């Protein structure tokens, strides 16, 4: 078969696959529209009285800026080797983290902040100051280096190892800041207490996991040496292992085997764990020796379908879960198209196509939708007079901003590395200075030669 015929066959198969996927999702959306489109009865709900909304909103924005956004910039600086700049900005984060834990409070209308939010605040204080300490050691801060014990510790550990520790701790502060920012509204509205605690934990962990999964996808996509790394294993191989392990844990923790009866919830989540570890085994086998495979993406599609079919107590909750499942299925399907048809089972291409940014965004968006799909939050939406469409739009708007911040941080990191290669001064100025130095050295040599020639010769 000639190259032209191969391209024709490949293009035809790609078109057929795309048409089938479009038909599948069109049928899914139309099928959902045929369901009961009624609304929840809100006659029993009263509009909530939010006390000091302005000051609480400003407090949350400050927490967002100093405990999540600024630490993200610090992490970029740390990974780019700018330890001094990272440590300087980290001082600001550490001071605010202490004020957040010691003075400021995310209190509900009863003046109470839950223990999880309070404990996270104090944990973040300790973590930020420890990170700042290691940053000072790695950067050679004066008052720290004066101590003989610290000098011995630095010499034994090595500056390179200390910088690695600082990078890891800096990234951990970003993750903890994400938890704190997400817990703040929970504390302000008094959510996730008593019987609702388990549901909030499940939605928070699973939703954040999808957001982190999307970040890893875009990290591999944007950073060129990770994208083009010639390793013995592919990204699908790692994904399959993670899904397999997570599936095993989920299978044996969602139900007390032999100690209680089975409920619909147990069936749903336990069998979801089973499909994760069984699919993970197949994915591990097919992706061995560095090969690509569709299995992790297919597992995501089935997970999205299962979540979209979960019936909830509230109609708005059912519709939000349905949207979450639909977006998750889109992410898995787009990933299959990328691997099988765009990359053609290769690791990477010469350049990044705009299409490749879509699958990670779907994962980030689905994660935020799942985090916002717990029952108490949706009851608050009903009490405020909103519906599922407005709620989904505001969450997707947040997903756009989160995804923008992820890509912006990665691009900022690459910019710092590029500036580091060029040097502090502009390249033209450096070349000019180098030429001046060379000419100055030549002048010195010529002057020395003249002096030697004019030296009197004594017989």
Swiss-Prot record:
One family name in Pfam for this protein: Ytp1
Cellular component, GO annotation: membrane
TM region positions: 7-27, 60-80, 83-103, 123-143, 171-191, 206-226, 267-287, 296-316, 323-343, 352-372, 390-410
Keywords annotated in UniProt: Membrane, Transmembrane, Transmembrane helix
Signal peptide: none
Compartments reported by the entry: Membrane
Highest taxon of the lineage: Eukaryota
Record membrane topology: Multi-pass membrane protein
Cytoplasmic-side positions: 28-59, 104-122, 192-205, 288-295, 344-351, 411-459
Predominant localisation class: membrane
Ranges in the topological domain labelled Extracellular: 1-6, 81-82, 144-170, 227-266, 317-322, 373-389
Family matches, as PANTHER family: INTEGRAL MEMBRANE PROTEIN (AFU_ORTHOLOGUE AFUA_6G12730)-RELATED (PTHR31685), PROTEIN YTP1 (PTHR31685:SF2)
Protein name in UniProt: Protein YTP1
Source organism per UniProt: Saccharomyces cerevisiae (strain ATCC 204508 / S288c)
């Amino acid at each position: 078969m000639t190259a032209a015929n191969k391209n024709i066959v490949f293009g035809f198969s790609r078109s057929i696959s795309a048409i089938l996927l479009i038909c599948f999702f069109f049928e899914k959306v139309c099928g959902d529209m045929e369901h009961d489109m009624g609304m929840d009865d809100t006659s029993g709900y009263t509009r909530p009285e939010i006390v000091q909304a302005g000051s609480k909103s400003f407090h949350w924005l400050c927490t967002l800026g100093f405990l999540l956004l600024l630490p993200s910039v610090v992490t970029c600086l740390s990974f780019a080797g700018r330890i001094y700049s990272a440590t300087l900005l980290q001082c600001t984060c550490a001071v605010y983290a202490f004020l957040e834990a010691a003075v400021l409070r995310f209190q509900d209308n009863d003046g109470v902040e839950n223990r999880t939010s309070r404990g996270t605040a104090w944990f973040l204080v300790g973590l930020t100051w420890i990170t700042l300490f290691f940053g000072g050691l790695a950067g050679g801060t004066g008052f720290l280096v004066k101590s003989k014990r610290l000098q011995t510790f630095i010499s034994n550990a090595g500056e390179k190892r200390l910088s690695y520790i600082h990078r890891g701790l800096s990234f951990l502060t970003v993750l903890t800041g994400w938890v704190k920012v997400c817990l703040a509204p929970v504390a302000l509205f008094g959510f996730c207490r008593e019987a609702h605690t388990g549901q909030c934990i499940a939605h928070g962990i699973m939703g954040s996991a999808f957001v982190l999964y999307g970040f890893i996808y875009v990290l591999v996509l944007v950073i060129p040496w990770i994208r083009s790394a010639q390793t013995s294993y592919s990204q699908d191989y790692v994904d399959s292992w993670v899904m397999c392990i997570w599936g095993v844990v989920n299978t044996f923790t969602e139900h007390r085997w032999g100690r209680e009866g089975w409920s619909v919830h147990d069936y749903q989540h336990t069998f979801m764990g089973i499909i994760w570890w069984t699919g993970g085994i197949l994915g591990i086998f097919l992706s061995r020796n560095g090969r690509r495979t569709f299995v992790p993406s297919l597992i995501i599609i089935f997970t999205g379908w299962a979540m979209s079919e979960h019936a909830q107590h509230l109609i708005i909750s059912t519709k939000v879960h349905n949207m979450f499942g639909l977006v998750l299925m889109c992410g898995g399907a787009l990933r299959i198209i990328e691997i099988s048809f765009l990359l053609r089972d290769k690791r990477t291409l010469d350049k990044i196509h705009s299409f490749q940014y879509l699958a990670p965004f779907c994962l980030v968006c689905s994660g935020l939708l799942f985090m916002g799909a717990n029952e108490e939050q949706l009851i608050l939406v009903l009490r405020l007079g909103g519906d599922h469409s407005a709620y989904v739009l505001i969450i997707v708007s947040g997903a756009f901003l989160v995804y923008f911040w992820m890509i912006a941080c990665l691009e900022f990191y690459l910019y710092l590395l590029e500036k580091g290669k060029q040097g502090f001064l502009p390249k033209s100025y450096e070349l000019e200075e180098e030429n001046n130095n060379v000419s100055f050295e030549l002048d010195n040599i010529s002057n020395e030669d003249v002096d030697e020639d004019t030296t009197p010769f004594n017989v």
